[in-house]
């Protein structure tokens, strides 16, 4: 299984309940498509290098996972692009 890290930035004005629901939803998208989540944690609220959608700060969330194929990653990528609460995301394959 290949190891991946996903970092995504959530809009800073989201309510805590909505943020937890968003994280749970995207974690379940990964697991329902065959990935195994090793760790999913909030990093911190950070100032952005440049303004994104009129926001100067964002809530960073990191997910470490293992996957045998790209199905889960492609579905995460597709859904995070159309979700208004996620400002940016990045998927990186880690060295084994």
From Swiss-Prot:
Sorted UniProt keywords: Ribonucleoprotein, Ribosomal protein, RNA-binding, rRNA-binding
Keyword tRNA processing carried by entry: no
UniProt keyword Transferase, yes or no: no
Pfam family, one: Ribosomal_S6
InterPro entries listed in its UniProt record: Ribosomal_bS6, Ribosomal_bS6_sf, Ribosomal_S6_plastid/chlpt, Transl_elong_EF1B/ribsomal_bS6
GO terms assigned for molecular function: small ribosomal subunit rRNA binding; structural constituent of ribosome
Gene Ontology BP, a term: translation
Gene Ontology cellular component terms for the protein in this record: cytoplasm; ribonucleoprotein complex; ribosome
Function, as annotated: Binds together with bS18 to 16S ribosomal RNA.
Protein family according to the UniProt entry: Belongs to the bacterial ribosomal protein bS6 family.
Protein name according to UniProt: Small ribosomal subunit protein bS6
Species of provenance: Streptococcus equi subsp. zooepidemicus (strain MGCS10565)
Gene: rpsF
């Amino acid at each position: 299984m290949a190891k991946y890290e996903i970092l995504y930035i959530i809009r800073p004005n989201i309510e805590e309940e909505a943020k937890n629901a968003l994280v749970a939803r995207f974690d379940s998208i990964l697991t329902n498509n065959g990935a195994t989540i090793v760790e999913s944690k909030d990093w911190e609220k950070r100032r952005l290098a440049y303004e994104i959608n009129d926001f100067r700060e964002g809530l960073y969330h990191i997910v470490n996972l293992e996957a045998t194929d790209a199905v889960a990653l492609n579905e995460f990528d597709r859904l995070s692009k159309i979700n208004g609460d996620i400002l940016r995301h990045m998927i990186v394959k880690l060295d084994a």
